[in-house]
Amino acid sequence: SALVLASLIAVVGMKAYAAGKAAASDLEPVRSLDLARYMGTWYEIARYPNRFERDCAGFTTATYTAMPSGRVKVENRCRTPDGGTDVATGVARQCGPGDSPRLKVRFAPALLSFLPPVWGDYWVIDIDRNYELAAVSEPGRDYLWILSRTPQVEKRALDALLARLSGQGFDMRKLVYTPQE
């Protein structure tokens, strides 16, 4: 019983810390997002290391598909070190108006979708006018993904994006580049 109470206090404390950190963030997403144009497959060019992709060795993609409910099906795929494929399927929802660049995403079972902690922030913080190169993060800047419609990105476009991200407080030294062959 004491262990359960201590665990509950720890979880509530972590959520409060995360909420405070998010509230103090000055990170701004793009002004608006045309979700229909965002649909389709994106290749991961680079990312901050994270536990979600611990077993990924390369050829990482994210495919977004509009659902009749207005939500978005998310399918993340990557090649594993043994040559297999790892797939994670989730759901995203837009927060706010229909052009909001702020989304919430979950990979937990639908049965748990009523629990706020299973939904994570997914903010589009940079995207080019052609919807071919994007950066995604969340208020705490703990996660960062650079996504492209193609497996390779022109160096000039990538360098310009990296400069903008650095200007927003991201540490470019933490980036891990994703092999896409």
Place the predicted regions along the sequence by residue.
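A beta-rich soluble binding module of mature secreted/lumenal proteins
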Residues: 1-181
